[in-house]
């Protein structure tokens, strides 16, 4: 069982979503947005840090997943986004959480099945996947999608690890049987 905190960073609105993963089962724990209405960037970053810290304290997540920076048309916007993202990551690291990063395109591909999905499609699929009665706000839905992507990544990694272990076990058994058969310990009955 793991509790995953997903973050959709923004300098004005930072979405968050928290889920619990038990095997393949995902359970919604909470979501929302940290809104920073002040004008100066340092105060916004301070509020993002405080907000993420409060969420970590409240939900006690085991893992922290965040969207990677994408290339924006406006360099100033990209820099502010990077600073907001860094602030959220520092809050996670200060609580000894492992940090995982996912590209927006991968998140959309994982949750919707299309890497170019829009916010409404992501919102709809998050609502279905987590069996929510109401649609979360778009920033929270994006953060939940990031958490879902991380949960999917964990499942995929476990599947691969189990496959590797199974292959190694099969190889060891085959080698053992070949050794014993060649020594005459086993006889094939036909």
Curated annotation (Swiss-Prot):
PANTHER family per record: CROSSOVER JUNCTION ENDODEOXYRIBONUCLEASE RUVC (PTHR30194:SF3)
Subunit and interaction comment: Homodimer which binds Holliday junction (HJ) DNA. The HJ becomes 2-fold symmetrical on binding to RuvC with unstacked arms; it has a different conformation from HJ DNA in complex with RuvA. In the full resolvosome a probable DNA-RuvA(4)-RuvB(12)-RuvC(2) complex forms which resolves the HJ.
Subcellular location: Cytoplasm
The protein's name in its UniProt record: Crossover junction endodeoxyribonuclease RuvC
Function (record text): The RuvA-RuvB-RuvC complex processes Holliday junction (HJ) DNA during genetic recombination and DNA repair. Endonuclease that resolves HJ intermediates. Cleaves cruciform DNA by making single-stranded nicks across the HJ at symmetrical positions within the homologous arms, yielding a 5'-phosphate and a 3'-hydroxyl group; requires a central core of homology in the junction. The consensus cleavage sequence is 5'-(A/T)TT(C/G)-3'. Cleavage occurs on the 3'-side of the TT dinucleotide at the point of strand exchange.
Gene3D superfamilies: Ribonuclease H-like superfamily/Ribonuclease H (3.30.420.10)
Assigned EC number: 3.1.21.10
A Pfam family recorded for this sequence: RuvC
Record's catalysed reaction(s): Endonucleolytic cleavage at a junction such as a reciprocal single-stranded crossover between two homologous DNA duplexes (Holliday junction)
Xref: NCBIfam families: ruvC
Cofactor: Mg(2+)
Species this chain originates from: Haemophilus influenzae (strain PittEE)
One cellular-component annotation, GO: Holliday junction resolvase complex
Note describing how the cofactor binds: Binds 2 Mg(2+) ion per subunit.
Active site annotation, chain numbering: 8, 67, 139
Any one biological process term the GO annotation gives: DNA repair
Family annotation (InterPro entries): RNaseH-like_sf, RNaseH_sf, X-over_junc_endoDNase_Mg_BS, X-over_junc_endoDNase_RuvC
């Amino acid at each position: 069982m793991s509790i995953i905190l997903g973050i959709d960073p923004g300098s004005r609105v930072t979405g968050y979503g928290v889920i619990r993963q038990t095997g393949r089962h995902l359970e919604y724990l909470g979501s929302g947005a940290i809104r920073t209405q002040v004008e100066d960037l340092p105060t916004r970053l301070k509020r993002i840090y405080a907000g993420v810290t409060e969420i970590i304290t409240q939900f006690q997540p085991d893992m922290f997943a965040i969207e990677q920076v994408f290339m924006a048309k406006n360099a100033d916007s990209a820099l502010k986004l990077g600073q907001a993202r860094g602030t959220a990551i520092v809050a996670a690291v200060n609580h000894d959480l492992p940090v995982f990063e996912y590209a927006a395109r991968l998140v959309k591909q994982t949750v919707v099945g299309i890497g170019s999905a829009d916010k409404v499609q992501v919102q709809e699929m998050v609502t279905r996947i987590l069996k929510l009665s109401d649609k979360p706000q778009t920033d929270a839905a994006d953060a939940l999608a990031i958490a879902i992507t991380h949960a999917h990544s964990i499942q995929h990694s476990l599947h691969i690890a189990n496959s590797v272990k199974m292959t190694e076990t099969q190889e060891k058994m085959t080698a053992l049987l070949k050794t014993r058969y060649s020594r005459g310990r086993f006889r094939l009955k036909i």
